[in-house]
Amino acid sequence: SPSNSKCPDGPDCFVGLM
């Protein structure tokens, strides 16, 4: 998972990055 603490583990994380 990304080092971004604001980004939770899981598909939602990738959606947020996009």
Swiss-Prot record:
Methionine amide: modified positions: M18
InterPro entries xrefs: Tachy_Neuro_lke_CS
Keyword Disulfide bond attributed: yes
GO biological process, one term: neuropeptide signaling pathway
Signal peptide annotation: none
Subcellular location: Secreted
Disulfide bonds: C7-C13
Chief location bin: secreted
Gene Ontology cellular component terms for the protein in this record: extracellular region
Coiled-coil annotated residue ranges, if any: none
PROSITE patterns named among the record's database cross-references: TACHYKININ (PS00267)
Sorted UniProt keywords: Amidation, Disulfide bond, Neuropeptide, Secreted
Functional summary from the UniProt entry: Tachykinins are active peptides which excite neurons, evoke behavioral responses, are potent vasodilators and secretagogues, and contract (directly or indirectly) many smooth muscles.
Family stated for the protein in its record: Belongs to the tachykinin family.
Name under which the protein is recorded: Scyliorhinin-2
Annotated organism of origin: Scyliorhinus canicula (Small-spotted catshark)
